[in-house]
Amino acid sequence: MTDRFAVFGNPISHSKSPQIHAMFAKETGQTLTYEAILAPLDGFAEAVTAFMAAGGCGANVTVPFKEQAFTLCDELSDDARIAGAVNTLIKLPDGRLRGDNTDGMGLVADLIRHGVELNNKRVLLVGAGGAARGALLPLVRAGAKLTISNRTLSKAEALAALCPKVNVEVISGSHIRSPFDVIINSTSASLSGDLPVIAANAIDNQTVCYDMMYGAKPTVFNEWARSLGAKICIDGLGMLVGQAAESFYLWRRVRPNAAPVLQTLRQSLISGV
């Protein structure tokens, strides 16, 4: 029987995951099916259990179920534990569920794909919500000298405390006095046409700026960063493809090439398909 995978969410019709994983499977010569499943808001656990019982081998999880997926798992990766959320479910040989969070790995992979060095670089992570939590451990593993900025400073401090063995600094965005090597906007501010609170001093002509949001046009954050002379501005489409590639690897132990998939999705975005 062909191995079955799926993505669970609500809403889910917009998901690019089936298209992405179909391209990954074709490129790597893997035989599998991957579908989008609309889970009821009050029936996520039941939907996943039914899918796995019917032969499902693994799944992705998107909003609003990542925290519920966390509680559903029998074991968790370090990334998932720090994130407090799961976006990848792996059915183990004994039927138990292992949860992982590949969002941060996708972010780091995309930065590396753009030639961005993270080791010993001053990295500002803007925001302290779920997206920031998912990025925290992979950025620390990559050797970043991490600073967290958030509108509510206590949330940034709580996030920094999740990595007690590493010196993660916390700062108010309006108090930044010198430029960072890399700035990562993990907030969803760009979706509403807003900017996070960051002093213009944070950016100079050597700063790489990354917005986890993406669209057919440059995000508001990236437009602002470019106007201040940022060296490179990158949106989050590559992070989407990167996290999918990491999920695919966890399931199949074959690492797909993200670049051609990213190019296809970018062209679709621009053309409005």
From Swiss-Prot:
The protein's name in its UniProt record: Shikimate dehydrogenase (NADP(+))
EC number: 1.1.1.25
Family in the record: Belongs to the shikimate dehydrogenase family.
Positions bound to NADP(+): D78, G127, A128, G129, G130, A131, N150, R151, T152, L153, S154, K155, M212, G236
UniProt-annotated binding residues for shikimate: S15, K16, S17, T62, N87, D103, Y214
Origin superkingdom: Bacteria
Assembly, per entry: Homodimer.
Lineage of origin: Bacteria, Pseudomonadati, Pseudomonadota, Gammaproteobacteria, Alteromonadales
Organism of origin: Shewanella amazonensis (strain ATCC BAA-1098 / SB2B)
